[in-house]
Amino acid sequence: MSTQSNRNALVVAQLKGDFVAFLFVLWKALNLPVPTKCQIDMAKVLANGDNKKFILQAFRGIGKSFITCAFVVWTLWRDPQLKILIVSASKERADLNSIFIKNIIDLLPFLDELKPSPGQRDSVISFDVGPAKPDHSPSVKSVGITGQLTGSRADIIIADDVEIPSNSATQGAREKLWTLVQEFRALLKPLPTSRVIYLGTPQTEMTLYKELEDNRGYTTIIWPALYPRSREEDLYYGERLAPMLREEFNDGFEMLQGQPTDPVRFDMEDLRERELEYGKAGFTLQFMLNPNLSDAEKYPLRLRDAIVCGLDFEKAPMHYQWLPNRQNRNEELPNVGLKGDDIHSYHSCSQNTGQYQQRILVIDPSGRGKDETGYAVLFTLNGYIYLMEAGGFPDGYSDKTLESLAKKANEWKVQTVVFESNFGDGMFGKVFSPVLLKHHAAALEEIRARGMKELRICDTLEPVLSTHRLVIRDEVIREDYQTARDADGKHDVRYSLFYQLTRMAREKGAVAHDDRLDAFRLGVEFLRSTMELDAVKVEAEVLEAFLEEHMEHPIHSAGHVVTAMVDGMELYWEDDDVNGDRFINW
């Protein structure tokens, strides 16, 4: 054997024995930059066979899926008899990983032996490596989490981003996902070398990964985009922080606190831009990998404090009793709230009803870009504020949007249209006024907002919710969820009013999008004076005045039931009309 051949054999042996070395060679072949320190650290963790059940969490854009595909190839090179199952949220995503694995095998000449032989499986979704012995299960199989998981056994299961916004936004969706991942136990070979590896980024505060850690004995290793920014964040990470980062941080926490962990990949300027784009909560989830946000003090606006029920469009009960319990919990509506923040109807309500008193349409005009023109339709009655409709339009204040808003005003027979004048110095009102007049006669009022938006929202809405004076028409929640879409028309729960409401905090940039929420806040602020009424007291006073006025009328006999409106309250009574003498003379 020539000296060159000897050197080649030594290099190949080194690559086969060291995944980090293999990664450097592969990155070079792919014309990628040299692996960064965090990528190298991830490679070491993956190659450590002692990690049997663990969750690898790394910030968006670090390349964890690429590294894991490389790990699959390297693992099969070392032991071609292993069976690996790749599961992703969608079939397409799983297949992309499978295709990339095949491309790696085709790319590196020293991996020729891994190419499928004639007669072996050789498809995108399922293939064998050359030295693999005939077996019921393929060497590599890719499948979506909702696909056909059964029928194969695996030595290693890699769950790559099985949690995405569309399958984790509501409590019902999260429960379904949790049920699906329980199948992994039946698919994993009962061997001491078998492994389950989750790769992912938390999508919600109630992330699947937290449940796995708390209830299934998984360990979590985290590579956040920044070193811990506070003592509280450091305490949350604890032993979860990648050992390399933990050692670096402990040695120089004063200099490293809040600094980028991998400045070659993302420097501070890049990360600041992403924080503005995702909002503080989104950035903390997807770049800091910290789902520990479910704090009642931090997030004061909760769905459970509202009353959600079906509503008549003309009248409503005079008062409600709020008492959240299992009997009045609504599990059919899409719930985008935090964990434990359930949707409830009322416990009981008054038999007396009244016509709605004020009817307003509120508009938060937007400019161009990613903002929506948010709107809300609010009614009032006896100290309660009713949310009848809410939504947003993605195209600023185009003619189409103005027409749609004017039609909303007519549909709900509003008396007043309220808009925020900060945008364009009142220009929206001048543009909208003639369009509104064409469809509906209503007053047009502008409100100028002052101070930090997040503080305004929390300070305005918290008293309404904490006193249970907000009543939400049940279909508003369903429609809001279905219409939450980004500028490209893709479903994005961050545009939902109730997602924005439950993630709002008293800090700058708490949520990335707040257009629907700000419109709702504007309407509540406009109607705030109506909340000064004591619903039960007002109802009693109206009834007492009614009775006092008619106590002196003679009663002749039992008659038929009559209804009438008194001070906005609808009353029912039995009247005698035998001789033309009415018990109550209206």
From Swiss-Prot:
Positions occupied by motif Walker B motif: 156-161
Origin superkingdom: Viruses
Keywords, sorted A to Z: ATP-binding, Endonuclease, Hydrolase, Magnesium, Metal-binding, Nuclease, Nucleotide-binding, Viral genome packaging, Viral release from host cell
Record region (ATPase activity): 1-229
Region feature (Involved in prohead binding): 571-586
Record-stated family: Belongs to the Teseptimavirus large terminase family.
Recorded domain comment: The ATPase region is in the N-terminus, whereas the nuclease region is in the central part. The C-terminus is involved in prohead binding.
Protein name: Terminase, large subunit
